[in-house]
Amino acid sequence: MNYKFGVYGDSIAFGYGNNNQSWFDELYLRNEALKLAQNGEKIEDVFSKIKQDNNHYDTLFLAVGINNLLSGAPKPNQIDISNLINQYEEVLKVAKTKASNIVVQSVLPIREELFPNQDWLDEDKWGFNADVETFNQKLAELCEKHQIKYLDAYTGFCSLDLLKIYMDAVHLNKQGQNELAKIYNK
């Protein structure tokens, strides 16, 4: 089947905590669109799903990575970012066969001070903006290499008051989803 828009991603694209309504619903679901984002998704989950997807999209959004960047170690730089980028590259290779246009969204900043006490985590994990920044830099380079549009939402969110737009350490409230929709609309 052909869709104008599709999204693969994690809980932020799914709309966790917002009655499952995200920036994608706000901007695209009135069109021929398919939302394939799910809570807890990692890069490898998106790869498994996108390989099996028989649909074609005019524009496919990829918004995943934060769940891969959470670690059991309470300090930054414990994640093998190069391995994650290699996994993401495999996703992009398959995505190119499924969509005319691809947009890759950066991982958003996190509220480090709230880790590890997050109800949505099964175990204690930590997240660090230093890891997010490194990942985003490498992801932007990967997108440039593959001539895929990279949407830097991280920088825009760093200028906002995260206390007002986040409901926990990583998830956006309705106002946060609206801010992300504004970035997509630019």
Summary of predicted features, one role per range:
Residues N2-V7, I12-E90, V94:
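Conserved SGNH/GDSL esterase-like catalytic core that processes O-acyl groups on lipids
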Residues R30, K35, V46, A140, ...:
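Histidine-centered active-site loop/cap adjacent to the catalytic His
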Residues E44, L69-P74, E113-F115, D161-Y166:
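A short acidic, helix-capping loop that chelates divalent metal ions and anchors anionic groups
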Residues A63, Q105-S106:
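Alpha/beta-hydrolase-fold catalytic nucleophile elbow
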Residues P74-I81, L121-W126, I165-A169:
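Short glycine-enriched, charge-decorated loop/helix-capping segments at active-site entrances
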Residues T97-I102, I148:
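A short helix->loop->beta-strand "cap" motif at the edges of active sites that frequently abuts
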Residues S106-P109, A153-T155:
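Short, well-ordered beta-to-alpha junction loops that form the rim of enzyme active sites
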Residues E112-A153:
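Substrate-gating cap/lid alpha-helix
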